């Protein structure tokens, strides 16, 4: 399973760890992804999404029905 948010598209990014001596070693910054089920009232079923916490806030704001419609318009299977 890839580490990509289905709602926002957030992916891992790369950067550096910096020690006290300013030595740089490469590292990855991973998005805060959660597996979550949402109830779709119109379809009378649950949908499982792998979303970031930012994606959860977007769903709280817009509503799951609107977000799922946007995902389907993008061609993503939900």
UniProtKB/Swiss-Prot annotation:
GO molecular function, one term: structural constituent of ribosome
GO biological process, alphabetically ordered: translation
Single GO cellular component term: cytosolic large ribosomal subunit
Pfam families xref list: Ribosomal_L28 (PF00830)
Ribosomal protein is among the record's keywords: yes
Lineage: superkingdom: Bacteria
Disordered: annotated segments: 1-21
UniProt record similarity statement: Belongs to the bacterial ribosomal protein bL28 family.
Protein name listed in UniProt: Large ribosomal subunit protein bL28
Annotated source species: Shewanella piezotolerans (strain WP3 / JCM 13877)
């Amino acid at each position: 399973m890839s580490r990509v948010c289905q709602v926002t598209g957030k992916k891992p990014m790369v950067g550096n760890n910096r020690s006290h001596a300013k030595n740089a070693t490469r590292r990855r910054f991973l998005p805060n992804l959660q597996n979550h089920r949402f109830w779709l009232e119109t379809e009378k079923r649950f949908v499982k999404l792998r979303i970031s916490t930012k994606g959860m806030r977007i769903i709280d704001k817009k509503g799951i029905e609107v977000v799922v419609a946007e995902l389907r318009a993008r061609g993503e299977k939900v």
